[in-house]
């Protein structure tokens, strides 16, 4: 799914969507965080499995990693809740990106951050 979106930034590792084992195998002492598009919008509407998001949350907590949810396409009420991740209880992302739902057609985005 990277074709057409290259070159990528150095230092980022991509894993298959909803594959928690691949995530676990990529974490090392240089890992700063986990970035995921919670509902992938290219090639259809593909939400992350709830169990996957719960495990990502725990991995981030256990390894003191930042958890970053990209909700540019699905945030701000587009799934029936303010954020798509609100459909899963007790998720605590450190960063959430939002955009399309706040702009009303105007190109604007925002980051929601916690104190970490």
Question: Residue locations for each model-derived region?
Answer:
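Conserved N-terminal phosphate-binding loop of PLP-dependent enzymes in the Aspartate aminotransferase
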Residues: 1-116
């Amino acid at each position: 799914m990277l074709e057409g979106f290259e070159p990528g930034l150095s230092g980022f590792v991509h894993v298959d969507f909803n594959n928690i084992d691949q995530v676990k195998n990529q974490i090392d002492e240089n890992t700063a965080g986990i970035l995921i598009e919670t509902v992938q919008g290219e090639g259809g509407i593909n939400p992350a499995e709830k169990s996957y998001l719960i495990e990502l949350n725990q991995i981030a907590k256990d390894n003191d990693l930042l958890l970053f949810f990209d909700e540019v396409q699905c945030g701000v009420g587009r799934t029936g809740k303010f954020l798509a991740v609100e459909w899963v209880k007790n998720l605590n992302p450190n960063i959430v990106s939002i955009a399309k739902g706040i702009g009303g057609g105007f190109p604007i985005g925002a980051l929601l951050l916690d104190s970490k």
